[in-house]
């Protein structure tokens, strides 16, 4: 009798647990189709599940997301008027309390579970997707490649200088030992044993890159991509997924991009423009400066200050030398933070924010009237911003492409 009672009790418990699981699933797991109303006009019907960022992309509405949907960049903002659930803690570091009350959400964090009514920026409807072909993918510095893509014939990416595109990568496995890297850069790669790394990605990924090309360079998109290797103090950390993929690309390979996006645009004034860059932050600097001089024929005073580690890390030197020779309103300067003995360097040395201050802004009659455009590693950006604040430069004249943020 006790055995039979035990079996009955066990069966009842199993049935209760099964019913609880089914009930929880009905509440937590979405099934069937839902409808998303966009900007009060367009209605999208789609299967429930996934995140709003991806769901909109599947319908051809590409919301900018520099981090590819990881919740770290804070750029994929939409307004959720109804549906979408409560705002998540991961969103609150990017969205103020006032914005949250107005329905602002990060689309990469919003679950598609119920019908929704949302608002997106009108400019996203001008965003398109292209399958491009790799023209070249050459080292410009030890850890920076210039990826040059051909846009499909008859197509055009209508971007503004300082804008960016998003690049997609399929699931892949990339071995660093297979990278095509010129001999002149092997010293550092050998020193840090970077050839050992392998990047394995099981799902499609998306990342944003500022363009080094400017609008008059028709038919191509140029990017400067720094390889994201594990830091020396954490050698077991995984390497950067997208940068590893991009570094593996070869001429003829197909690459999917979407865009254009951006907000790091030049102001339409006559103020002096001071560009400050470092590392792969060269990309939007080149785009802006070429656009101002070659396309707009700007008469504004323009200076460019670039920080590099050694002479080996300098690139586009001939391009900027030619601009300086052709346009009397443009000058450019490089500061090396760690020049090598063989560099025989007699130019500026030290960190770029100090060099800009000592050699340009210290005795400038009105630095607060200049416009400052910067892009570089986070520590460079922070140092430059502090220096500018100390000089009395207002926020509205400090424009930052924060690719490291």
UniProtKB/Swiss-Prot annotation:
Residue segments, region Catalytic: 270-387
Membrane topology: Single-pass membrane protein
Keyword Cell wall biogenesis/degradation: no
One of the record's GO molecular function terms: oxidoreductase activity, acting on NAD(P)H, quinone or similar compound as acceptor
EC number per UniProt: 7.2.1.1
Location within or outside the cell: Cell inner membrane
A GO biological-process term: sodium ion transport
Listed Pfam families: FAD_binding_6 (PF00970), Fer2 (PF00111), NAD_binding_1 (PF00175)
Annotated ranges, domain FAD-binding FR-type: 127-267
UniProt catalytic activity: a ubiquinone + n Na(+)(in) + NADH + H(+) = a ubiquinol + n Na(+)(out) + NAD(+)
SUBUNIT field: Composed of six subunits; NqrA, NqrB, NqrC, NqrD, NqrE and NqrF.
Function: NQR complex catalyzes the reduction of ubiquinone-1 to ubiquinol by two successive reactions, coupled with the transport of Na(+) ions from the cytoplasm to the periplasm. The first step is catalyzed by NqrF, which accepts electrons from NADH and reduces ubiquinone-1 to ubisemiquinone by a one-electron transfer pathway.
This protein's name: Na(+)-translocating NADH-quinone reductase subunit F
Provenance organism: Neisseria meningitidis serogroup A / serotype 4A (strain DSM 15465 / Z2491)
Gene this protein is translated from: nqrF
């Amino acid at each position: 009798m006790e055995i039979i009672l035990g079996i009955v009790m066990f069966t009842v418990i199993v049935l209760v647990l099964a019913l609880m699981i089914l009930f929880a699933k009905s509440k937590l797991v979405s099934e069937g189709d839902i409808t998303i109303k966009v900007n009060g006009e367009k209605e999208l019907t789609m299967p429930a599940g996934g995140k709003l960022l991806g769901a909109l992309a599947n319908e051809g509405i590409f919301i900018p997301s520099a981090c590819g949907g990881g919740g770290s960049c804070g750029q994929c903002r939409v307004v959720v008027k109804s549906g979408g659930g409560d705002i998540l803690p991961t969103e609150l570091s990017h969205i103020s309390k006032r914005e949250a009350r107005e329905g602002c959400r990060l689309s990469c964090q919003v679950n598609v579970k119920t019908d929704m009514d949302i608002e997106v920026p009108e400019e996203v409807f001008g965003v398109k997707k292209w399958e491009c072909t790799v023209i070249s993918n050459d080292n410009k510095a030890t850890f920076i490649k210039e990826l040059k893509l051909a846009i499909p014939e008859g197509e055009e990416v209508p971007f503004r200088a300082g804008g960016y595109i998003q690049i997609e990568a399929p699931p892949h496995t990339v071995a660093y030992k297979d990278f095509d890297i010129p001999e002149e850069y092997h010293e550092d790669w050998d020193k840090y044993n970077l050839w050992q790394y392998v990047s394995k990605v099981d799902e499609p990924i998306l990342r944003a890159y500022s363009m080094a090309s400017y609008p008059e360079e028709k038919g191509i998109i140029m990017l400067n991509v720094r390889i994201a290797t594990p830091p020396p103090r954490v050698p077991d950390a995984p390497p950067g997924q997208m940068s590893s993929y991009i570094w593996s690309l070869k001429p003829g390979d197909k690459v999917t991009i979407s865009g254009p996006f951006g907000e790091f645009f030049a102001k339409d004034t006559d103020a002096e423009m001071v560009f400050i860059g470092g590392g792969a932050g060269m990309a939007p600097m080149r785009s802006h400066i070429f656009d101002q001089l070659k396309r707009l024929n700007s008469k504004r005073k323009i200076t460019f200050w670039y920080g590099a580690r050694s002479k080996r890390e300098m690139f586009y030197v001939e391009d900027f030398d030619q601009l300086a020779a052709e346009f009397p309103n443009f000058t450019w300067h490089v500061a090396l933070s760690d020049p090598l003995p063989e560099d025989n360097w007699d130019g500026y040395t030290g960190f770029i924010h100090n060099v800009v201050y000592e050699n340009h802004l210290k005795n400038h009659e009105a630095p607060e009237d200049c416009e400052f455009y910067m892009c570089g590693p986070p520590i460079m950006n922070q140092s430059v911003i502090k220096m500018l604040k100390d000089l009395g430069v207002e926020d509205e004249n400090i424009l930052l492409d924060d690719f490291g943020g």
